[in-house]
């Protein structure tokens, strides 16, 4: 992946000297928070919770989802979302808005913005090739998400923009989209196709003409003609797109932008989170927070060095110990419970010990996975969110998650 960091320095991890949780500091101090992670880990809900916290802390906040499952509207208690920000009413000092990315509408607006004349814009928007690619071309959604992010940040009154990204491996395209667009606009073939004054036949060599004739036989001459007309109508606009992509790239790397990784205790999602953290590190981007959802509570654990860890809540930077009221459950603790269950086999209390042993075995494995992940993103702060009684589908459910994510850090 190409690094977007050349434009500016990476912000350091925040501290919690005043009793705020480190993640609450991100909400207070950053302009953009990007929630990343694999599918099925509660990332969409987490993005909504972060945005809600922004409103509760007095910020004018908008949350953007490009999640095709459209779960964000459910989490916010809305019937649906559109490409226009919708206000979510609530009794909080700030404002909360939400929208669903509409790739084609965003692309249309960008064309209209950079067209030299209204006529040029109309020709492109009416072009059959453009209508086909504007919502379906690979990478278009990712770039338009970045364009919407830039628009909301630079051309609106929002203090905080929270972005819910696609599942992990697609999110890498999301990060690299501005640079890929720039490379495309600089490609020699593109530059030849946008030069109507020289004519296509004069601009391309014999091999290219042969290729176009072959393509015409497969997809139809009208499709190729539309494509050529589109590129020629695009002439003069590429510099505006290129400059916009560069500014988006700078924004991703700016200190005001924070990347928060979302995961769950399952091995596959932890591996995905490791993968994404590694790719971010390669790009020179620091993970500013880790939120782990659906953490199993622990019973009968042993206290870790330096004290116990809560079953849910925010840990300061460097404290990566998932655990329960008595700290993390080690494999030795789980084995000890299993031996006691065998000793008491056939009794009611023995059955209870067997259930506890099975539970501890699960939590022991999960905690081993999570400890490695927390170490991989250190010194980023970590928040553990326990299993909840029901899925989050309204503001009340989001409040319950927020109590764990943004739990205040005790001060000395």
Question: Could you describe each region identified by the protein language model?
Answer:
Residues 1-27, 209, 213-232, 242-412:
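C-terminal lobe/tail of nucleotide-utilizing enzymes
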Residues 2-33, 41, 46, 50-242, ...:
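Nucleotide-state-sensitive switch-loop elements of NTP-binding domains
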Residues 37:
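The Walker A (P-loop) glycine that initiates the GxxxxGKT/S ATP-binding motif of P-loop NTPases
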